[in-house]
């Protein structure tokens, strides 16, 4: 038997079938580094339009988790796709370096008695070490960026830039010092930002407390009575007994109806709607003897239950019904609403009672409870209330309560003297910060769109921003306060620039070591030098100033506004939020044009990642076992706008999809063996109809993919590339061209036409996958035929694809119809194979009984229909002649009959043909193969 293998154009490529990503990816990273890929991208991007994605800095603490990986990969995919779209898309990664978590880590490691200077030194060293660890992990993900020169909020230039940003906001008239209740953590010993507050369940004591009337006549008058026949009291309900010693007022709603209830031994004031539930709670019988609106009770004095002072009634719209008594006890030092109401009624700061120290312990001088920790004082306070006859009822509840994000301990609101950026303070010129920010939100594009309403609601309802902290490791607030007036030095902005210049040379230590006389001269004794530091959200919130127009200038001619900020959805109250406020205060617009948010990672059942649940997926483990490209494909395959599921099973599915894409690319490469695009590429008009369709289909898909990339819809990109590989290519086109590729002449038009199509498709595909499968794309790039530069990323979307003319006879709709017929034939072939009626498809002969229109269409392929259907014979017959055993299909007007061929199998092409052995010199092969070996070769027109 003759071996005809040498006469075939068998596929061949050195591109490995097995990806071996964990081993190969580090080699590719090394290559990118050695050729200076990121630098080359900046070089070719010089004259391109710029796209600026500004990196929200992760905190310089700990190893990266899967959420970090998701975030960085999304950013990299966007920037790579923008580069391929013809933009200059730089990426400057950054780190958030100051703040309590690092200071806390240093204190835990070295103790709390280090001294401020040593603490800062150790914090800086710790942050530096953490950044190096995280940096190598991010690079391993295939993220291209300026890793040799990232921005760090602790770099001297950035610290100085932050001071300059603050100076701009001071100049704008937004900064003030005030006594206000702020989120306070006893363990931190400092105020916390809104973004540092978490809510967890807490068990608390609830109490109903009676405040006895101090002015009987006024209360009687308010209820339309001549006098009060019995002692009277107003009843409040609270979940914070520890605030009772600081009570200074009682709040009622001006429009609610309040009842005077006779309960036998006294009269109680309660909201009318709450009378029934309150009496049931107190186990009392009673009757309503009079009612009055809340506004009638204004300024009536009641007595504190155990201190000799008065508590007047103030009107407050925030009072609600539904729980409690309809009366809210008011401690202005420990509640934002309480504080606002008391200030509205003329209470000055010196009158506010604030007995809780920074560590959560009452001042020693507080009568009855001095020296006690507030959360342990609930019971002594309850006992005191019971002793004086003021306790109506007590119970325990489980409720959602604010906790420190770092220590997981309960917080309180505590009035302290702090520095604020005012939301409604009249600035030097223009609108208030709240008005500016709300307008800026309207001018910003949000992906997904619901982010706009979320951020709008937060800005509309937020209090003034407390920007000061009482910590060591932070950028200083370099203010001098007049000891007498409490006012800022008149040259504050000028002095801040002098300080910024020193910080730029020496770091924040320059301020802390500064002798005031160096700057103020003879004025120094008149001023206090402030030791507060800035909220870390101010650090990251001003990166648009100290990075984009500071340490790493980049942006557009219209100003350094970024095109995109991309972070997790929690950043609506974090980085997006603080950046919006500082941007509007400094520039009167948001520092970004578009906000994109992604959800959080969960396991496949929707549970959060937790070590206790043993469902944590570490990026390093994925890199070491599957490869970063599999992680990147998982990211691309998921709609990131909601929760993003990840597990070993989900990653395994991504690995399967990866193999399909890789194998498709490898098949095309292997069939490009011996193809030189410089000499073998055919013009479109010389290509076979099927090949022209394949290139046209690739072009249409490329347009769709470019649109999806532009909208950051990577899951659409992934699914369409995968489907293209599985269906149009793997399930149709690549199957059909195998015979032509392998059996026709090596330099025949039939083969070169297919190779031309494969070349065009491969050139397009390698670019499509480059933003997602960063490593694999560059590996594939090296094996493509023809001269090329060092990386796929140094190019733009492929422009060599051609469109089918509108009048092309075998156009798009035609091939869609043929594909449907092929699917129907394949389905019947599977049935026949399962029944052992035929072996392989090439043992089959198929007759298509079709209606006239379909017959005419299929007849256009002439005798090449069999190559499309991959059967040895394909015959057409009228639909009306279909025998009873012909099989109906899902294609209208088509029935099929498949039989096993009676003809011998060609040893070369494996088709069963009647002319096998006709040529005595080649008794084992068909006439077509004889012609391809020793004759002029077959001529194909369509497929």
From Swiss-Prot:
The catalysed reaction is: tRNA(Ile) + L-isoleucine + ATP = L-isoleucyl-tRNA(Ile) + AMP + diphosphate
| Residues annotated to bind Zn(2+) | 906, 909, 926, 929
Task: State any GO CC term.
Answer: cytosol
**A Pfam cross-reference name:** Anticodon_1
Q: PANTHER family, per this entry?
A: ISOLEUCINE--TRNA LIGASE, MITOCHONDRIAL, SOLEUCYL-TRNA SYNTHETASE
User: What family is this protein classified in?
Assistant: Belongs to the class-I aminoacyl-tRNA synthetase family. IleS type 1 subfamily.
Name of the protein: Isoleucine--tRNA ligase 1
- Species per Swiss-Prot/TrEMBL record: Pseudomonas fluorescens
């Amino acid at each position: 038997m003759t071996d005809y293998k040498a006469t075939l154009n068998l596929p061949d490529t050195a591109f490995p079938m097995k990806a071996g990503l964990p081993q190969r990816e580090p080699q590719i990273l090394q290559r990118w580094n050695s050729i200076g890929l990121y630098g080359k991208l900046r070089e070719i991007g010089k004259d391109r339009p710029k796209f600026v994605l500004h990196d929200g800095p992760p905190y310089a603490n700990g190893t990266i988790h899967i959420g970090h990986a998701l975030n960085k990969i999304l950013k990299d995919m966007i920037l790579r796709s923008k580069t391929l779209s013809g933009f200059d898309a730089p990426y400057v990664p950054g780190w958030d370096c100051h703040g309590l978590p690092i200071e806390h880590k240093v204190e835990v490691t070295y103790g709390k008695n280090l001294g401020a200077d040593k603490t800062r030194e150790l914090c800086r060293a710790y942050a530096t070490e953490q950044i190096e660890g995280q940096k190598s992990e991010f690079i391993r993900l295939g993220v291209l960026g300026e890793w040799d020169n990232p921005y760090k909020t602790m770099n001297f230039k950035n610290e100085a830039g932050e001071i300059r940003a603050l100076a701009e906001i001071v100049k704008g008239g937004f900064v003030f010092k005030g006594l206000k209740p702020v989120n306070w953590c006893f363990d931190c010993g400092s105020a916390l930002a809104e973004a540092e507050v978490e809510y967890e369940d807490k068990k608390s004591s609830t109490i109903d407390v009676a405040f006895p009337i101090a002015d009987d006549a006024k209360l009687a008058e308010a209820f339309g009575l001549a006098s009060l026949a019995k002692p009277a009291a107003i009843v409040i309900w609270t979940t914070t007994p520890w605030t009772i010693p600081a009570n200074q007022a009682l709040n009622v709603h001006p429009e609610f109806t309040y009842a005077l209830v006779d309960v036998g031994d006294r009269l109680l004031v309660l909201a009318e709607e709450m009378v029934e539930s309150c009496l049931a709670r107190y186990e009392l019988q009673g009757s309503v003897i009079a009612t009055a609106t809340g506004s009638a009770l204004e300024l009536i004095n009641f007595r504190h239950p155990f201190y000799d002072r008065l508590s007047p009634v103030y009107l407050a719209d925030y009072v609600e019904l539904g729980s409690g008594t309809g009366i809210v006890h008011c401690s202005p030092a420990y509640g934002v609403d309480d504080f606002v109401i008391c200030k509205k009624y003329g209470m000055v700061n010196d009158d506010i009672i604030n007995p809780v120290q920074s560590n959560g312990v009452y001042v020693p001088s507080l009568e009855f409870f001095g020296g006690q920790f507030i959360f342990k004082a609930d019971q002594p306070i309850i006992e005191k209330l019971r002793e004086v006859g003021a306790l109506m009822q007590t119970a325990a509840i489980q409720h959602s309560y604010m906790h420190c994000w770092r220590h997981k301990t309960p917080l309180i609101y505590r009035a302290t003297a702090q520095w604020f950026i005012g939301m409604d303070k009249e600035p030097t010129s223009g609108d208030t910060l709240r008005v500016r920010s709300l307008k800026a939100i309207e001018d910003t594009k949000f992906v997904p769109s619901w982010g706009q309403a979320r951020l709008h609601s937060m800005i509309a309802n937020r209090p003034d921003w407390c920007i000061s902290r009482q910590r060591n490791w932070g950028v200083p607030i370099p203010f001098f306060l007049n000891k007498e007036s409490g006012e800022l030095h008149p040259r504050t902005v000028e002095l801040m620039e002098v300080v910024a210049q020193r910080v730029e040379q020496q770091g924040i230590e320059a301020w802390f070591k500064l002798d005031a006389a160096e700057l103020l001269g003879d004025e120094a004794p008149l001023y206090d030098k402030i030791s507060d530091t800035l909220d870390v959200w101010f650090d990251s919130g001003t990166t648009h100033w100290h990075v984009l127009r500071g340490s790493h200038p980049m942006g557009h001619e219209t100003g350094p506004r970024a095109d995109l900020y991309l972070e997790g959805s929690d950043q609506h109250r974090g980085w997006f939020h603080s950046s919006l406020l500082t941007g509007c205060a400094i520039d009167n617009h948001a520092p970004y044009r578009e906000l994109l948010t992604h959800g959080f990672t969960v396991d496949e059942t929707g549970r959060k990642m937790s070590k206790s649940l043993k469902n944590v997926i570490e990026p390093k483990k994925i890199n070491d076992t599957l490869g970063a490209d599999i992680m990147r494909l998982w990211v691309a395959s998921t709609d990131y706008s909601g929760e993003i599921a990840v597990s070993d099973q989900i990653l395994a599915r991504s690995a399967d999809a990866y193999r399909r894409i890789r194998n498709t690319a490898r098949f095309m490469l292997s069939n490009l063996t011996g193809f030189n695009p410089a000499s073998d590429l055919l013009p479109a008009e010389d290509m076979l109809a099927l090949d022209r369709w394949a290139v046209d289909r690739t072009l249409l898909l490329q347009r769709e993919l470019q649109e999806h990339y532009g909208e950051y819809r990577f899951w659409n990109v992934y699914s369409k590339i995968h489907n293209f590989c599985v269906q149009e290519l793997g399930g149709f086109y690549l199957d059909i061209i195998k015979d032509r590729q392998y059996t026709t002449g090596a330099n025949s038009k039939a083969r070169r036409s297919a190779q031309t199509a494969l070349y065009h498709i491969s050139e397009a595909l390698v670019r499509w996958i480059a933003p997602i499968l960063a490593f694999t794309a560059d590996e594939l790039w090296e094996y493509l035929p023809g001269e090329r530069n060092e990386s796929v990323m140094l190019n733009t979307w492929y422009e060599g694809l051609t469109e089918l003319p509108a009048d092309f006879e075998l156009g798009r709709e035609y091939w869609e119809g043929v594909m449907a017929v092929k699917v129907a034939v394949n389905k019947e072939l599977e049935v026949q194979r399962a029944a052992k009626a035929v072996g392989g498809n090439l043992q089959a002969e198929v007759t298509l009984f079709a209606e006239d229109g379909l017959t005419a269409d299929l007849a256009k392929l002439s005798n090449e229909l069999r190559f499309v259907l991959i059967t040895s014979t394909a015959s057409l017959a009228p639909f009306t002649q279909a025998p009873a055993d012909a099989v109906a299909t899902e294609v209208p007007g088509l029935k099929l009959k498949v039989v096993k061929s009676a003809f011998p199998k060609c040893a070369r092409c494996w088709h069963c043909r009647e002319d096998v052995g006709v040529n005595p010199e080649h008794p084992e092969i068909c006439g077509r193969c004889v012609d391809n070996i020793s004759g002029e070769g077959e001529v194909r027109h369509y497929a």
